């Protein structure tokens, strides 16, 4: 669309990665160009850019205020991370239409470079949620005398690195629960569940190895299952709004009375989802692995193991099973070479998330009926996706995982 003699106004970023996607982190320099194409000479008062990053939360609730009276309560909150303005052409005052200070731009294409530095302090990862978002953008404004300004806004992605190679994220997660079913005056045997995963931190594209034992001493047929859930929490005016959504799930074999099932590293793959957001005061994004037993006619028995979805994959010697790493010192530059004896590295964000996926959310995933009842509502997979390119690191999976378990008495004979 031609606006006067301005044919086009665009913004392009100088990307820091090979995938040509504008992705930045705190402390990075964001640079780019405002591209202006005109079909004839134009007079310009100013060409400005405005860059901003902020988290914003908003939701409404309906309340009763007496007989046949209701009102809507709005909850909003905002956190600003940075606010940068710069003038590429002209001067600050746009209301001055005097001939002095006008700049003439000739017909053709013109580029005007801009640059600014993101704060060194941690920034929240870009995110689009049900009741809030974290967004970063650059807006260009072209002001001309006696004409409306031409404006354009373009977003860029910011993410904070979460390195899963930290002691807290490399520690195993485990738990045990038991449930006894009662029906009037009759009590059946217990249903017991024990589950363990090798660590707390993972990256998208990895598969979680689940080690579990389910013992059914009840009289009912039960089904062991597992699911990854994302929890979005939004905070405003002292209130909190939470949304829980299914990310991935799996189902085990039905387990009849007196039987036991063991999972020796059953795999559940993490789809392309946004990293955990843990440092924003008004938006929090967390993940959990739920290993549970579907019990017909009763509340399910479930075990909740916390997860952190990071951006930097597991180091080759980050695994607890690497004994060589603690016994020798060497130049780590050799890691860039091929290591045929090691398992394949977890895929990078660029491999996991395509450009098409980045533009479109995941299709809704149908949730399990039992968890719909527990959460009192349907679940929707509304996951913000990114196309990241973390360092090309490798991971190591223990070829002989510890499968030992505590000896438990078998179900009592009936």
Swiss-Prot record:
GO cellular component, one term: early endosome
Protein's UniProt keywords contain Flavoprotein: no
Keyword Transit peptide: no
One BP term from GO: protein transport
Location relative to the cell: Cytoplasm; Cell membrane; Lysosome; Endosome
SUPFAM superfamilies: E set domains
Lineage: superkingdom: Eukaryota
Ranges of Basic and acidic residues composition bias in the record: 405-414
Keywords: Cell membrane, Cytoplasm, Endosome, Lysosome, Membrane, Repeat
Short sequence motif named PPxY motif 1, residue ranges: 346-349
Primary localization: cytoplasm
Region (Disordered): 393-414
Subunit organization: Interacts (via PPxY motifs) with NEDD4 (via WW domains). Interacts with ADRB2. Interacts with ADRB3. Interacts with HGS (via PPxY motifs). Does not bind TXN (thioredoxin). Interacts with ITCH.
Family statement drawn from the similarity comment of this UniProt entry: Belongs to the arrestin family.
Name listed for the protein in its UniProt record: Arrestin domain-containing protein 3
Native source species: Pongo abelii (Sumatran orangutan)
């Amino acid at each position: 669309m031609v606006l006067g003699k301005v044919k086009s106004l665009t913004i392009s970023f100088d990307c820091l990665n090979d995938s040509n996607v504008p992705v930045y982190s705190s402390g990075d320099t964001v640079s780019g160009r405002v591209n202006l194409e005109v079909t004839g000479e134009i007079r310009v008062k100013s060409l400005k850019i405005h860059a901003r990053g902020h988290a914003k939360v908003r939701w409404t609730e309906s309340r009763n205020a007496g007989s046949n009276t209701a009102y809507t309560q709005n909850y909003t909150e905002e956190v600003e991370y940075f606010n940068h303005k710069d003038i590429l052409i002209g001067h600050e005052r746009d209301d001055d239409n005097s001939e002095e200070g006008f700049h003439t731009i000739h017909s053709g294409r013109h580029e005007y470079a801009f640059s600014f530095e993101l704060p060194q302090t941690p920034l929240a990862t870009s995110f689009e949620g049900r009741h809030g978002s974290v967004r970063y953008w650059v807006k260009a404004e072209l002001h001309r005398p006696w004409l409306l300004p031409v404006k354009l806004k373009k977003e860029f992605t910011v993410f904070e690195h979460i390195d899963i190679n930290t002691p807290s994220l490399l520690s195993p997660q485990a738990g045990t629960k038991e449930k006894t079913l009662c029906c009037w005056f009759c009590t059946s045997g217990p249903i017991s569940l024990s589950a363990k995963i090798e660590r707390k931190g993972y990256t998208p594209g990895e598969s979680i190895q689940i080690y579990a034992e389910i013992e059914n001493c009840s009289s009912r047929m039960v089904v062991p299952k597992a699911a990854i859930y994302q929890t979005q929490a939004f905070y405003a005016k002292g209130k909190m709004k939470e949304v829980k959504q299914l990310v991935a799930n799996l189902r085990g074999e039905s387990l009849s009375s007196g039987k036991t099932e063991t999972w020796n590293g059953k795999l559940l793959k993490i789809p392309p989802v946004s990293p955990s957001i843990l440092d924003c005061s008004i938006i929090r994004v967390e993940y959990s692995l739920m290993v549970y037993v579907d019990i017909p006619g009763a509340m399910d028995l479930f075990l909740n193991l916390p997860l952190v979805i990071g951006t930097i994959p597991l180091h080759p010697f980050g695994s607890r099973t690497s004994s060589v790493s603690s016994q020798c010192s060497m130049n780590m530059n050799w890691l860039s070479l091929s290591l045929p004896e090691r398992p394949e590295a977890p895929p990078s964000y660029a491999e996991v998330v395509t450009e098409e996926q980045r533009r479109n959310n995941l299709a809704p995933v149908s949730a399990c009926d039992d968890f719909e009842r527990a959460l009192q509502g349907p679940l929707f997979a509304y996951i913000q996706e990114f196309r990241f390119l973390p360092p090309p690191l490798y991971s190591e999976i223990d070829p002989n995982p510890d499968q030992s378990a505590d000896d438990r008495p078998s179900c009592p004979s009936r």
